[in-house]
Amino acid sequence: VGFKAGVKDYKLTYYTPEYVTKDTDILAAFRVTPQPGVPPEEAGAAVAAESSTGTWTTVWTDGLTSLDRYKGRCYNIEPVAGEENQYICYVAYPLDLFEEGSVTNMFTSIVGNVFGFKALRALRLEDLRIPPAYSKTFQGPPHGIQVERDKLNKYGRPLLGCTIKPKLGLSAKNYGRAVYECLRGGLDFTKDDENVNSQPFMRWRDRFLFCAEAIFKSQAETGEIKGHYLNATAGTCEEMIKRAVFARELGVPIVMHDYLTGGFTANTSLAHYCRDNGLLLHIHRAMHAVIDRQKNHGMHFRVLAKALRMSGGDHIHAGTVVGKLEGERDITLGFVDLLRDDFIEKDRSRGIYFTQDWVSLPGVLPVASGGIHVWHMPALTEIFGDDSVLQFGGGTLGHPWGNAPGAVANRVALEACVQARNEGRDLAREGNEIIREASKWSAELAAACEVWKEIKFQFEAMDTL
């Protein structure tokens, strides 16, 4: 006789504390703030339902499928210590709910409608466990850390970069000049600012040509392999690929994409093109703070970082811990490890809610940039280790003698820190001393040390556990 119509509590179907998670499930940890009067079990079940098979009322067509096979399940709830009316709700999703190789589809399900749900005051996705059965459907980064080092022939140290400033307003020729001076001075990379696409004062093709000239000239003069992150981000996917094709024709080693504003579909297409054509891919995270900065609502950056590793990128910006942009040390190192390592153990003290096994998916180099200068070099070398890119925009171009001496100062400081570390010295304790010693034989470094000796950006970090 018909079916039982009407509205029933989500928790009757979607709260299943007895459920044992499967190795193939995608697991999510949500920070849930229910509306007053909504019990946490109902809130957690509502999240599981609305991000999987559920809707607000029982529907006749439920009888045509097996909910037990396809529904998301809230399988554990724990109160957040020190916060009133906040809970971590763990949800397991069966693998079949997601299209293979599509970050777009994964996010449409897990963080789609549910974030506007009335029964919740706020909702934040803190972490995702991506099972190998799903991650294996992605290509991942075009090349990964080891292949990049082999392409660049640079080992045993972090790589050095610089974002060209002023970010907007330079002509293509003057822009190329700044690129040449930085690379000639000793940097490995220079970078298009994320805002630089193809504006009236500098069209993309002109910039690509002048930057390519700067790369080849500096390579010939230094004997080192150089690169400039040519931003291929554009208004359409077709235009983006057209720019990447032109970069490949010029013979440059690396292009760049703004993955959140550009979108995961565009990013994954570009990553596939880059692997097929031997281009490295630098990823900028413009817009991330819109999504990840609020503690109780949105998505933590570690989720965006995991999504990028699946979608594909060889570098991604990841905060500095010491400069002008967000970053709490343990939490930052938590998602840095999620980007670089194959296997990362669950560690709540670093914000890692699940053990993550990437199997053989290539790693991503974290990029530290934003308000950093030569005095930060020992701390950065110690915190990020060799597999990282340290990017000094103002910290290169703000040098009192100009761009090339700014690059020299950064390279000398980095080499001094790496040598000191290799000799067994403690960078955290002796950092300032190491920089002072090096500045005695490098006038460029001495001048940089003088300019930035007092600069600190001290605010409370927002990103706490």
From Swiss-Prot:
Question: Post-translation: what modifications?
Answer: The disulfide bond which can form in the large chain dimeric partners within the hexadecamer appears to be associated with oxidative stress and protein turnover.
Q: What name does the UniProt record give this protein?
A: Ribulose bisphosphate carboxylase large chain
The cofactor note from the UniProt entry for this protein is: Binds 1 Mg(2+) ion per subunit.
Its assembly, as annotated, is: Heterohexadecamer of 8 large chains and 8 small chains; disulfide-linked. The disulfide link is formed within the large subunit homodimers.
Sequence similarity: Belongs to the RuBisCO large chain family. Type I subfamily.
Q: Which GO terms describe its cellular component?
A: chloroplast
Q: Does the keyword Oxidoreductase apply?
A: yes
Identify the catalytic residues.
165 (proton acceptor), 284 (proton acceptor)
> Which UniProt key words apply to this protein?
Calvin cycle, Carbon dioxide fixation, Chloroplast, Disulfide bond, Lyase, Magnesium, Metal-binding, Methylation, Monooxygenase, Oxidoreductase, Photorespiration, Photosynthesis, Plastid
Disulfide bond found in the keyword field: yes
Residues recorded as bearing N6-carboxylysine in the entry: 191
- EC number, as in UniProt: 4.1.1.39
Which of this chain's residues are annotated to bind substrate? 113, 163, 167, 285, 317, 369
| Origin species | Acer saccharum (Sugar maple)
Q: Which residues carry this modification: N6,N6,N6-trimethyllysine?
A: 4
Marked site (Transition state stabilizer) residue numbers = 324
Broad class of the protein's primary localization: plastid
Known role: RuBisCO catalyzes two reactions: the carboxylation of D-ribulose 1,5-bisphosphate, the primary event in carbon dioxide fixation, as well as the oxidative fragmentation of the pentose substrate in the photorespiration process. Both reactions occur simultaneously and in competition at the same active site.
Primary gene name = rbcL
- What are the GO BP annotations of this UniProt entry? photorespiration; reductive pentose-phosphate cycle
Q: Which reaction(s) does its UniProt entry say it catalyses?
A: 2 (2R)-3-phosphoglycerate + 2 H(+) = D-ribulose 1,5-bisphosphate + CO2 + H2O; D-ribulose 1,5-bisphosphate + O2 = 2-phosphoglycolate + (2R)-3-phosphoglycerate + 2 H(+)
The lineage, from the top, is:
Eukaryota, Viridiplantae, Streptophyta, Embryophyta, Tracheophyta
Where's it found, cell-wise? Plastid, Chloroplast
Please name the Pfam families in this protein's record: RuBisCO_large, RuBisCO_large_N
Q: Which cofactor does it need?
A: Mg(2+)
